Curated annotation (Swiss-Prot):
Effect of L290S: Reduces activity by 86%
Record's catalysed reaction(s): carbamoyl phosphate + L-ornithine = L-citrulline + phosphate + H(+)
UniProt GO BP: arginine biosynthetic process via ornithine; citrulline biosynthetic process; L-arginine biosynthetic process
Regulation: Forms a stable complex with CAR1 in the presence of ornithine and arginine. In this complex CAR1 retains activity, but ARG3 activity is inhibited.
Outcome recorded upon mutating D182N: Reduces activity by 33%. Reduces affinity for ornithine 30-fold
PANTHER family in alphabetical order: ORNITHINE CARBAMOYLTRANSFERASE, MITOCHONDRIAL, ORNITHINE TRANSCARBAMYLASE, MITOCHONDRIAL
Pfam families listed in its UniProt record: OTCace, OTCace_N
Species of the source: Saccharomyces cerevisiae (strain ATCC 204508 / S288c) (Baker's yeast)
Name under which the protein is recorded: Ornithine carbamoyltransferase
Record keywords, A-Z: Acetylation, Amino-acid biosynthesis, Arginine biosynthesis, Cytoplasm, Transferase
UniProt: L-ornithine binding residues: N185, D249, S253, M254
Amino acid sequence: MSTTASTPSSLRHLISIKDLSDEEFRILVQRAQHFKNVFKANKTNDFQSNHLKLLGRTIALIFTKRSTRTRISTEGAATFFGAQPMFLGKEDIQLGVNESFYDTTKVVSSMVSCIFARVNKHEDILAFCKDSSVPIINSLCDKFHPLQAICDLLTIIENFNISLDEVNKGINSKLKMAWIGDANNVINDMCIACLKFGISVSISTPPGIEMDSDIVDEAKKVAERNGATFELTHDSLKASTNANILVTDTFVSMGEEFAKQAKLKQFKGFQINQELVSVADPNYKFMHCLPRHQEEVSDDVFYGEHSIVFEEAENRLYAAMSAIDIFVNNKGNFKDLK
């Protein structure tokens, strides 16, 4: 299955992290950090003179899946740049009921400056990209979740004091990220994102649940050129050993509720708890993109001193700002950012 879309050469979309060069992804994270600093410092003059670049324009949010963090962060980021966010839920528009993707995309993209699309299938993202006249930002599909990856790497570099200058020079951080759980859209982007920063990745999934082959192939290439390691296992203790970052996600994704009991049985023993963190680095950090359920991580880990989940959630705002700035304000050009 193709993960890329055929679009006009002058138009760039954010579909997945694997579509970006290492340098481009690092710039996205660096830009997110920049906007966080501006936002936190409340630099009013800087904000008014440099950031209201979309005043009088509209950013559409076409969401066919429910959302908390993605909707709030996207609307907040649009407002930061002076744009009017327009939320279009599945009950608000004709998409998929009385109107095709082609017709919807042609109409909506003619009236807005960008479309954030949160959809069920990756093919739906590609359909938007194929016919849109404005940038499409993938806000989640069943294959990828790039905004979460930008946010996660921002959270990691802040907590481990990673220098982007050193990363760009090939100086490896020697960090290890361990993922315990499902082979899903979040880890598809996060593993590539970590490897682009030279962070080694170990992924533990239950037997019978495997990473997509195209993601594995790409991960191996990115790991090799950045001096990192990439490991797949079904042994969570092995994956967690000496890990600096422990990460999990929901075991039952949206749309899989019908199979909840079967999936929970399959994931028995994959909870991140004291047994797993006991073999991790003593200064480990725990991450989760939320919402969280008890079977995924114990309360003492989730709410413990090593957890950075709420900082991670806040960083979704700055990830959205970075995406808008580069793909809308700067028309997909990663150079000459102001």
